[in-house]
């Protein structure tokens, strides 16, 4: 900004020339025109003692000079003159202005406001029933600078529906259209500014802060808004207090010291200070004097650029200062404009021409800015000069400039102006102008602004940081905010080159949630999330359970998908059972092969011949049924498992039952009866018994499948990390009834052979059958408690094992001994050993008798 730098030097040179010389700056604060705009600017301030000692409603002297207020007033002058010199907005018309000093005091501001509301051509306000045709001295008012003053003037001007456009008042309450129907502003409301502040705190993880506000409407409302926004974002306010305005009384001093003590006790490193410049001046004065440890101060816009605060001695001791200022367009010619008018103020000829015009308002109001006419270099802070030279005050200057253009645009719309002229029928009244300002858009340099329904404009913010390059700070832009915060970390200066930490408790590790201690949510212990839950967000207070189809280990930040679990073919237990299947199936096939090879031998014939082979085939099918249990279950496999296992077993046990019945008959009945019954047990009737038993078992299986069909179930509760898919048995009682046929056959076999006495010199067939049935019962009786206690995932493996062990037991106890005789004891493979002498004789007699009868018949 070279032009602004030149302006700063020119201003300094002018002020040096102005030492001891009388200037005429105050006389430049009024200009005539077709329409007059009022202006309220903080050109000075008063001593607090003067207000305390005031006992009569007389004038209040403004003893201090405010350079910033002077620059803002000159920005309004420049905007008015720019509009008058152009033809884009008000061709053929001139705007005038009447600027007054608010002295930063409500009492002084009220007096100026009353002068604006006085009837044109007079200095008084008359009482009327209807003010519709009332013509005040000014058409609209620019200002004031502070929300405290705007709350007062806003109600004054709203009664007359006079448009008021503030360039700095940002209280959110001023957006209330019922109370302030004629109030507008060219800055965003404090709510937007505080949203930016909360975003800044979140960005640096500053969740343990103090919040202080000035003891006035501005500070109290700001604290209220900040508190609600901070709570919604998980930021804890360790201490919240109000700072009294600057006062030398002992009572006020005690309040300030109490605020400082409580901030120290809260052990915060960041303080949000939403206060007026006077309150901040009071707080920082005592903070520096009493040696408060440096903090990070997040400033409100009202004091971030205040020369009252920036020129405080030893201000650098307070620490780091950050704050947001609304962004505006640059006005590069403003430096030249200020330089020119300051030079004119020192020109005696120019001042003499102004003195020739009598200012009637000065008889009532007094001189507009007494301190402006005798300012000297020491009246202007070096920090303000540096910031102005660097273009750091352009946001406030532009806001004033834009406020003037908003009124000019509204007047342009009201008068229906075009590029050549305006339709001037009669003088425009303030309420007529106001009608055209609602939701109006207007141009100010490169920006297009628009008033919303609440009279606010939407503008971006610049994040400013105080940088100590001299006894007073200089503002540096270190970020922007337009709904999202963008920081320039390389431009930020921190003590020790480390970002301060302001947290009550450390950040929890991954997979941990917060358990609050006390009243503040930011003070907490970290608790691990248990298995099956996870931490969804870093600020969570409870662990979030995983979905049904997910799982998580302890201290998780996310859930993992559950893998399906079933008895897979590749599992070791399945592979072991498949090896056992091969063994049992191999033995059954070997026994079947030997039986077929020795089909005519007494051993095979005594064992039932075809029934013996049929039993071996059924035993093999019984073993093969285990192949239905491994793998991912399906509806078909679940339905087929029990029938495919029990029907072959019924066929096998029915043949063994016939063997047991024949053994019992031969041993316990007379020979004639025994021979007669044995002929039936070895003929067609024997197959009818097998068919009947199989039919009964098939009927039971059909009833089981129809009444209680097993189904594929997805079980989420059995395994912590997997989802179990298995065949669900809907009724264990019905499944037990499916076993009833086989159990009855086995019991009858055991009963028929256990009591039979063996005959000397004969093969003890009853012993093999007894042990075979014992193997059956031991297997399935052991199966019940084992199945009840094993995990559901491995219940199919238990059923597979029971089937194979049962088949192996029958093979080992009944079939393999016969194979042993066929292979290694062929001398015992005789009719006498397997059938006995009586049986052989009876067989021969039956054979001879049959032949004689046949010959007789022939």
From Swiss-Prot:
Signal peptide range in chain numbering: 1-20
Chain ranges on the Cytoplasmic side, renumbered to this chain: 594-610, 666-687, 757-767, 818-858
Gene Ontology biological process terms in this record: G protein-coupled receptor signaling pathway; sensory perception of sweet taste; sensory perception of umami taste
Broad class of the protein's primary localization: membrane
Membrane topology: Multi-pass membrane protein
UniProt-annotated location(s): Cell membrane
Effect of residue 61 to L: In strain: 129/J, 129/SvEv, AKR/J, BALB/c, C3H/HeJ, CAST/Ei, DBA/2J, FVB/N, ST/bJ and SWR/J
PTM (free text): The addition of even a short carbohydrate group at Asn-58 is predicted to disrupt one of the contact surfaces required for stability of a dimer.
Matching Gene3D superfamilies: 3.40.50.2300, GPCR, family 3, nine cysteines domain
Pfam families reported for this sequence: 7tm_3, ANF_receptor, NCD3G
Expression sites by tissue: Expressed in circumvallate, foliate and fungiform taste papillae as well as in taste buds on the palate. Also expressed in testis. Not expressed in brain, heart, kidney, liver or spleen. The topographic distribution in various taste papillae is different from those of other T1R members.
Domain of life: Eukaryota
Impact when changing residue 706 to N: In strain: SWR/J
Keywords: Cell membrane, G-protein coupled receptor, Glycoprotein, Membrane, Receptor, Sensory transduction, Signal, Taste, Transducer, Transmembrane, Transmembrane helix
Any one Gene Ontology cellular component term annotated for this protein: plasma membrane
Transmembrane segments annotated in the record for this chain: 573-593, 611-631, 645-665, 688-708, 736-756, 768-788, 797-817
Single Gene Ontology MF annotation: sweet taste receptor activity
Entry annotated with the keyword Nucleotide-binding: no
PROSITE patterns: G_PROTEIN_RECEP_F3_2, G_PROTEIN_RECEP_F3_4
Subunit composition and interactions: Forms homodimers or heterodimers with TAS1R1 and TAS1R2.
Similarity section: Belongs to the G-protein coupled receptor 3 family. TAS1R subfamily.
Protein purpose: Putative taste receptor. TAS1R1/TAS1R3 responds to the umami taste stimulus (the taste of monosodium glutamate) and also to most of the 20 standard L-amino acids, but not to their D-enantiomers or other compounds. TAS1R2/TAS1R3 recognizes diverse natural and synthetic sweeteners. TAS1R3 is essential for the recognition and response to the disaccharide trehalose. Sequence differences within and between species can significantly influence the selectivity and specificity of taste responses.
Protein name: Taste receptor type 1 member 3
């Amino acid at each position: 900004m070279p032009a602004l730098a030149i302006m700063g030097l020119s201003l300094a040179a002018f002020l040096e020339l102005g030492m001891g010389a009388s200037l005429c700056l105050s006389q430049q604060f009024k200009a005539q025109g077709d329409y007059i705009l009022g202006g309220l600017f903080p050109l000075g301030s008063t001593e607090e003692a003067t207000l305390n000692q005031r006992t009569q409603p007389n004038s209040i002297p403004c003893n201090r000079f405010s350079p910033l207020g002077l620059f803002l007033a000159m920005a309004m002058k420049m905007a008015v003159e720019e509009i008058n010199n152009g033809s884009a907005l008000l061709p053929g018309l001139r705007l005038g202005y009447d600027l007054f000093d608010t002295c930063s005091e409500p009492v002084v501001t009220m007096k100026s406001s009353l002068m604006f509301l006085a009837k044109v051509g007079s200095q008084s306000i008359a009482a009327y029933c209807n003010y519709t045709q009332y013509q005040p001295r000014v058409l609209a008012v620019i200002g004031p600078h502070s929300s405290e003053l705007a709350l007062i003037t806003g109600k004054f001007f709203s009664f007359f529906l006079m448009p008021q456009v503030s360039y700095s008042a940002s209280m959110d309450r001023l957006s209330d259209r019922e109370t302030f129907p004629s109030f507008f502003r060219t800055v965003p409301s404090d709510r937007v500014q505080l949203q930016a502040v909360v975003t800044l705190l979140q960005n640096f993880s500053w969740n343990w802060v103090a919040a202080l506000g000035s003891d006035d409407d501005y500070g109290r409302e700001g604290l209220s808004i900040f508190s609600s926004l901070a709570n919604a974002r998980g930021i804890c306010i360790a201490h919240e207090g109000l700072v009294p305005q600057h006062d030398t009384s002992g009572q006020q001093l005690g309040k300030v010291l109490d605020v400082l003590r409580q901030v120290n006790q809260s052990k915060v490193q960041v303080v949000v200070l939403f206060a007026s410049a006077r309150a901040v001046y009071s707080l920082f004065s005592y903070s520096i004097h009493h040696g408060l440890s440096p903090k990070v101060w997040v400033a409100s816009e009202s004091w971030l650029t205040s020369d009252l605060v920036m020129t405080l001695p030893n201000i650098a001791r307070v620490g780091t200062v950050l704050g947001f200022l609304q962004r505006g367009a640059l006005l590069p010619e403003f430096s030249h404009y200020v330089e020119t008018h300051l030079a004119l103020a020192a020109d005696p000829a120019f001042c003499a021409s102004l003195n020739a015009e009598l200012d009637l308002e000065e008889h009532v109001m007094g001189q507009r800015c007494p301190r402006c006419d005798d300012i000297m270099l020491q009246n202007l802070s070096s920090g303000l000069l540096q910031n102005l030279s660097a273009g750091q005050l352009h946001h406030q200057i532009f806001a004033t400039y834009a406020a003037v253009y908003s009124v000019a645009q509204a007047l342009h719309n009201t008068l229906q102006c075009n590029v050549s002229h305006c339709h001037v029928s009669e003088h425009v009244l303030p309420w007529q102008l106001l009608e055209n300002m609602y939701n109006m858009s207007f141009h100010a340099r490169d920006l297009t602004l628009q008033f919303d329904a609440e009279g606010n404009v939407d503008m971006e913010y610049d994040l400013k940081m105080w940088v100590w390059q001299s006894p007073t700070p200089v503002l540096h832009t270190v970020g922007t905010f337009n709904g999202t915060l963008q920081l320039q970390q390389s431009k930020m200066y921190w003590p020790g080159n480390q970002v301060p930490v302001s947290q009550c408790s450390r950040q929890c590790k991954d997979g941990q949630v917060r358990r609050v201690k006390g009243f503040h949510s930011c003070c907490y212990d970290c608790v691990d999330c248990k298995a099956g839950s996870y931490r969804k967000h870093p600020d969570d207070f409870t662990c979030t359970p995983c979905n049904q189809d997910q799982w998580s280990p302890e201290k998780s930040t996310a859930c993992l998908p559950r893998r399906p679990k079933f008895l897979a073919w590749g599992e070791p237990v399945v592979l072991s059972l498949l090896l056992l299947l091969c063994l049992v199936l191999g033995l059954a096939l070997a026994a079947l092969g030997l039986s077929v090879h020795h089909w005519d031998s007494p051993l095979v014939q005594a064992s039932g011949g075809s029934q013996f082979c049929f039993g071996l085939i059924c035993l093999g099918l019984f073993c093969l049924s285990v192949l239905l249990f491994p793998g991912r279950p399906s509806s078909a496999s679940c339905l087929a498992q029990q029938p495919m296992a029990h029907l072959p077993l019924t066929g096998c046990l029915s043949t063994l039952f016939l063997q047991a019945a024949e053994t019992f008959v031969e041993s316990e009945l007379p020979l004639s009866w025994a021979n007669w019954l044995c002929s039936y047990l070895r003929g067609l009737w024997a197959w009818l018994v097998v068919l009947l038993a199989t039919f009964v078992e098939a009927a039971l299986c059909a009833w089981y499948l129809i009444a209680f069909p097993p189904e594929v179930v997805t079980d989420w509760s059995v395994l912590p990390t997997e989802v179990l898919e298995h065949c669900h048995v809907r009724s264990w009682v019905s499944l037990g009834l499916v076993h009833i046929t086989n159990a009855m056959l086995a019991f009858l076999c055991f009963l028929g052979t256990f009591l039979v006495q063996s005959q000397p010199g004969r093969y003890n067939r009853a012993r093999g059958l007894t042990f075979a049935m014992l193997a059956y019962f031991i297997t399935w009786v052991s199966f019940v408690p084992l199945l009840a206690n094993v995990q559901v995932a491995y219940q199919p493996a238990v059923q597979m094992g029971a089937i194979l062990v049962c088949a192996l037991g029958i093979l080992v106890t009944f079939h393999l001994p016969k194979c042993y005789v066929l292979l290694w004891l062929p001398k015992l493979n005789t009719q006498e050993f397997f059938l006995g002498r009586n049986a052989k004789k009876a067989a021969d007699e039956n054979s001879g008798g049959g032949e004689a009868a046949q010959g007789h018949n022939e």
